[in-house]
From Swiss-Prot:
One Pfam family cited in the UniProt record for this chain: Ldh_1_C
Database matches in PANTHER family: L-2-HYDROXYCARBOXYLATE DEHYDROGENASE (NAD(P)(+)), L-LACTATE DEHYDROGENASE
Protein name according to UniProt: Malate dehydrogenase
Family listed: Belongs to the LDH/MDH superfamily. MDH type 3 family.
GO MF term (any one): L-malate dehydrogenase (NAD+) activity
Superkingdom in the source lineage: Bacteria
GO terms classed as biological process: carboxylic acid metabolic process; tricarboxylic acid cycle
Function, as annotated: Catalyzes the reversible oxidation of malate to oxaloacetate.
Source organism per UniProt: Bradyrhizobium diazoefficiens (strain JCM 10833 / BCRC 13528 / IAM 13628 / NBRC 14792 / USDA 110)
Matching SUPFAM superfamilies: LDH C-terminal domain-like, NAD(P)-binding Rossmann-fold domains
Binding residue positions for NAD(+): G10, S11, G12, Q13, I14, G15, D34, N96, I119, T120, N121
Annotated residues for binding of substrate: R83, R89, N121, R152
EC number, UniProt record: 1.1.1.37
Class in the EC hierarchy, top level: oxidoreductase
Length: 322
């Protein structure tokens, strides 16, 4: 049986890590695309040469033409300018919006049936623009944000409680930025809600607040440490979890930047919420009850995303007609 074709649009740090993980998990054959000549070809060859050692048979190719995306089953988009120290995700807006228009046109022409995962920042606005530019169904275009933000939250909690990350569940909703909403109420350790763990004396509310704040600034913390780029291992692993759920119809519930058309009181926007990802794409939006401070924080986050989308509309008004 022929292996699925997975196209990686952007061959930087995340793209290279994605390509290697796809081989290790044997999810399919890989096409690495980039506008920089030689870069995708070199990385594809390097990773392919690791296959005899790691024991996988995926086929790797590098390309500088969108034609290479032809009939890809999954497209993962990392193309764009990465964050640098002192730079917010929003600073990237005008530059990466142009990139999304080009990428969307390429996907529309060569991979119109693909499941598309966007990683490019500012995420929520870029996935909105990518869907507009590609014209693909909303359920087939999604943004990778919540899986990563939730993974950071889970890691910090596991470290705080000195337990396995496997026993920690956590959800982060809203936009992928400073206004994201880590939900303490719906986060657990071995099924025990975090508020109960505070009552049990495992931690304090003040400490939980610190962890929530660190989660919100998780990306910036790594940018400031690296000084020359942004995170790539955890973002790549997060996107692979989404791609695997689609390719293998696992129907995992994953927090993702998904299109909302009335859910959570939001219309015509991509915002981070829990969704079921299966072979049809985003098969269901999981609408959990938000109240009090959580609702206020979510609405504030939606407002921030709306501001970015409005900015996109001003910069590229032609997207609205698509």
């Amino acid at each position: 049986m022929a292996r699925d074709k997975i196209a990686l649009i952007g061959s930087g740090q995340i793209g290279g890590t994605l390509a290697h993980l796809i081989g290790l998990k044997e999810l399919g054959d890989v096409v690495m695309f980039d506008i920089a000549e030689g870069v995708p070809q070199g990385k594809a060859l390097d990773i392919a040469q690791s296959s005899p050692v790691d024991g996988f048979d995926a086929h790797y190719t590098g390309a500088n033409s969108y034609e290479a995306l032809d009939n890809a089953k999954v497209c993962i988009v990392t193309a764009g300018v990465p964050r640098k120290p002192g730079m917010s995700r929003d600073d990237l807006l005008s530059i990466n919006l142009k990139v999304m228009e080009q990428v969307g046109a390429g996907i529309k022409k060569y991979a119109p049936d693909a499941f598309v995962i966007c990683i490019t920042n500012p995420l929520d606005a870029m996935v909105w623009a990518l869907q507009k530019a590609s014209g693909l169904p909303h359920k087939k275009v999604v943004g990778m944000a919540g899986v990563l933000d939730s993974a950071r939250f889970r890691y910090f909690l596991a470290d705080e409680f000195n337990v396995s990350v496997e026993d920690v569940t956590a959800f982060v909703l809203g936009g992928h930025g400073d206004t994201m909403v880590p939900l303490v109420k719906y986060s657990t350790v071995a099924g025990i809600p975090l508020p109960d763990l505070v009552k049990m004396g495992w931690t304090s509310q003040a400490r939980l607040d610190e962890i929530v704040d660190r989660t919100r600034n998780g990306g910036a913390e790594i940018v400031n440490l690296l000084k020359t780029g942004s995170a790539f291992y955890a973002p790549a692993a997060s996107a692979i979890a989404m791609a695997e759920s689609y390719l293998r119809d696992k129907k995992r519930v994953l927090p993702s930047a998904a299109y909302l058309n009335g859910e959570y009181g939001v219309k015509d926007m991509y915002v981070g919420v829990p969704v079921v990802i299966g072979s049809k794409g985003v098969e269901r939006v999981v609408e959990i009850e938000l109240a009090g401070k959580d609702r206020e924080a979510f609405d504030k986050s939606v407002g921030a995303v709306q501001g970015l989308v409005d900015a996109c509309k001003k910069i590229a008004p032609d997207l609205l007609g698509r």
